[in-house]
Amino acid sequence: MAVVPLLLFGGLWGAVGASDLTVVTCGSVVKLLNTRHNVRLHSHDVRYGSGSGQQSVTGVTSVDDSNSYWRIRGKTATVCERGTPVKCGQPIRLTHVNTGRNLHSHHFTSPLSGNQEVSAFGEEGEGDYLDDWTVLCNGPYWVRDGEVRFKHSSTDVLLSVTGEQYGRPISGQKEVHGMAQPSQNNYWKTMEGIFMKPSELLKTEVHHAEL
């Protein structure tokens, strides 16, 4: 099997089979790019001054900011084993690596656009059912090169960016919020990160599909 290099954190390189790079798996740590506005999903220990007062979630243009890494996990109160391929239509959690809080939404109004607030919530990776997002994509699995949407499992809004920009103390960062309407503003794709190789489960399913 051909082997290709994969760029990981801080210039660390690994080698995995080319066919293993296509699906996104649980346990992977990734950056997510909003393809319409070219910003990466980001969080930090800065709280909203309005709404819920929880940790803010933004979009940043910087490629190398470590506060833009998110771990892909199973939905609340479940475990998705490392290397398990994420299916289209599957609910997941996205846990912010540096703060341990989960991507979250609720019926608060976002500060700039007046859409639905998106925050980071919980402690050490554990929050509540409002941390669950359903992966919307074409085909059986979420694939690395494919654009996906994230639909909040409880309120049905889509994770979105429409270009509103914050001032101090987070000058230049874009608001991330939830919107009911599907549009180009709510497409995302994986970029940099550590991608866990798919487990044997996927290989078994592919074999059966070919029989």
Task: Briefly describe each language-model feature range.
Residues A2-L211:
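Lectin-like carbohydrate-binding module/patch detector with strong preference for beta-trefoil
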